[in-house]
Amino acid sequence: MNETPEAPCLIETRDLTRIYGDGEEIRALDGVSLKIAAGELVTVMGPSGSGKSTLLNMIGALDKPTSGTVFVDGQDIAALHNKDEFRSKTVGFVFQLHNLIPTLTARENIEIPMIGHKGLGARRKRSAELLELVGLGDRMRHLPNQLSGGQRQRVAVARALANNPPLILGDEPTGSLDSEAGRALMGLLHDINQSQGTTFIVVTHDVAVARQTNRVLVMADGKIVREDIIGSPIEEDLKMWRHSGLGRRIVDGDHDGALKAITLPDRAMDAVRSLLGAANRS
């Protein structure tokens, strides 16, 4: 039987450290080493201040490490002479706020990263293809304020794909959306990952979002403290939340065992009910 060849490594960090502050030091990253293969769909979880966004900034050449190295597509980020060109051709970004220019149409917003790289005809062709890809082929002449929040984020995804980069970095791309729109956006990213082979790294606080990806990296205090492969039993939802530092939001009651009122993804809520039922029977 022929074995499926292993995907090449697209991203590698080696002992990556980022320290901020002239007085009291803040270690945003503390010796992070990881590898991400081409074609993976990965989420990064953890409490606020755990280093998630800093890690994305390092990979995307938006910040410099204090020590350690970052390789993306075989390139040492620190040795790049033109980081703008690298970001334009190799990495696309999708943030919590879409940052679309309000006076430009959806199509024109998508064409912005291609200016200087493609002629007008090629830009028009590519933007039309991308709007079809994200399900907005009939919205190309709409302004951002004529689109829903989920549609605006889809335009932002299309814009990130404009120059066909192998890597897309998403910092809370579903954070401003309701749960239904968030699931739809993650479904879109999954479809693009499968059909185009684009690698995605997505920062999120939402375990339901994480479960739509292949691998979850959990960070705390600037380190990767846990790694989960998606597809584990229902109880793993609770483990993921607890280890990511979000467990306090699940079970953080008084000494009498009372739980605070919160909203959880359905699978995590089922796990909570199961554990509470077992506790009541004991």
Where do the language-model regions lie?
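Pre-NBD coupling/linker segments of ABC/ABC-like ATPases
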Residues: 2-5
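Conserved beta-strand-loop-alpha-helix hinge in the C-terminal portion
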Residues: 223-250
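Non-catalytic connector elements of ABC transporters
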Residues: 257-282
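ABC family nucleotide-binding domain
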Residues: 9-212, 218-219
